């Protein structure tokens, strides 16, 4: 059984019922969901890292180092999107999901589109 670690930018305290963070780089934390065979195996949280320690790519590298394979986001700039592509993390667009649970369900149902440059923003809070 191969599992996938999915990161979802979230508001405090995180978890499946937490609201999604509007912008990946400025979220309170990431809810990490381990998925295998279409089921949630585990849920954990990971604090975000300050931008000062590596700029916009600090969160990208932080998530790559812990083995995240997929990120579901509602918003991000072009630079971090390119960074995720470079480190091999697939980025999906949250497509209006309000909670982590809704985002994960969208992923499991194949309803989340690839996060393309059409979804990028100029950065900052949403």
Question: Model-found features: residue ranges?
Answer:
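Non-catalytic interface/targeting segments
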Residues: 1-54, 86, 92, 96-126
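Mid-chain, well-packed structural core segment of small domains
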Residues: 60-96
């Amino acid at each position: 059984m191969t599992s996938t670690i999915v990161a979802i930018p979230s508001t405090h305290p995180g978890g499946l019922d937490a609201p999604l963070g509007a912008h990946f780089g400025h979220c309170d934390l990431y809810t990490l969901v381990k998925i295998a065979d279409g089921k949630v195996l585990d849920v954990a949280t990971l604090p975000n890292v300050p931008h000062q320690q590596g700029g916009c790519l600090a969160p990208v590298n932080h998530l790559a180092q812990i083995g995240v394979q997929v990120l579901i986001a509602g918003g991000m700039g072009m630079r971090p999107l390119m960074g995720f592509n470079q480190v091999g993390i697939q980025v999906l667009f949250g497509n209006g999901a309000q909670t982590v649970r809704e985002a994960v369900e969208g992923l499991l149902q194949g309803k989340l589109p690839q996060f393309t440059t059409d979804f990028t923003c100029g950065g900052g809070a949403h």
